Amino acid sequence: MIKNLFLFLTLFTVLPLQANTVESILENGMKIIVREDHRAPVVASQVWYRIGSTYEYDGITGVSHVLEHMMFKGTKKLKPGDFSEIIAANGGSDNAFTSHDFTGYHQRIASDRLEICLELEADRMRNVIFLQEEFNKELAVVQEERRWRVDNKPKSKLFEQFYATAFLSSPKRIPVIGWMGDLESLEMKDAADWYQQ
């Protein structure tokens, strides 16, 4: 009885949330999902790319995460760091993440500033530039992230080795942050080529 009540209440609370969601596909194939919520004059804008560690292969593991960092390092219009500075100057915040299957970029900003986010995302979707100095900095940051999150934590190292063994013939064996050996040999061209895909 309690199980059925829980299921009913769960459905009852989830169904109204779905009612305000609209999904459409643009001519270029990009899927747009909009969920309206007018409780506050704020918008959360997210762009997700179907790229992550499961698309990588030995020799370039970690390239999706490095590219995530490079997406903040300038375009034909913007200098390194300008993207986040523009969002912050308009009262917003931004960040990004890489997973096995997706890489996402998100901003939270006043709803009357949504156009700024969309213009910035459209720019970096097509116009990221790769500067060797910026690449070297970000590669070092990702390597340090790996040391901090995995190499210096026995439990994390254990789970990484477990996944590598359990998913031996699956791309899920590749850690999102990449193998340190691959990160040490990764070149800017690898990230630039990954971006062009």
Regions found by a protein language model. Give the residues of each.
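Bacterial N-terminal signal peptides
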Residues: N4-P16
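Hydrophobic side chains within alpha-helical segments
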Residues: L7, E68-M71, V141, W148
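Intrinsically disordered, low-complexity segments enriched in polar/charged residues with Gly/Pro
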Residues: L9-F12, T21, V34, S170-K172
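Active-site-proximal flexible loops/turns
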Residues: T10, F72, N152
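His/Glu-rich zincin catalytic helix
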Residues: L17-S84, H106-I109, E115-M125, A192-Q197
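Acidic/histidine-enriched segments that form metal/cofactor-coordinating
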Residues: Y49, T75-K76, D82-W194
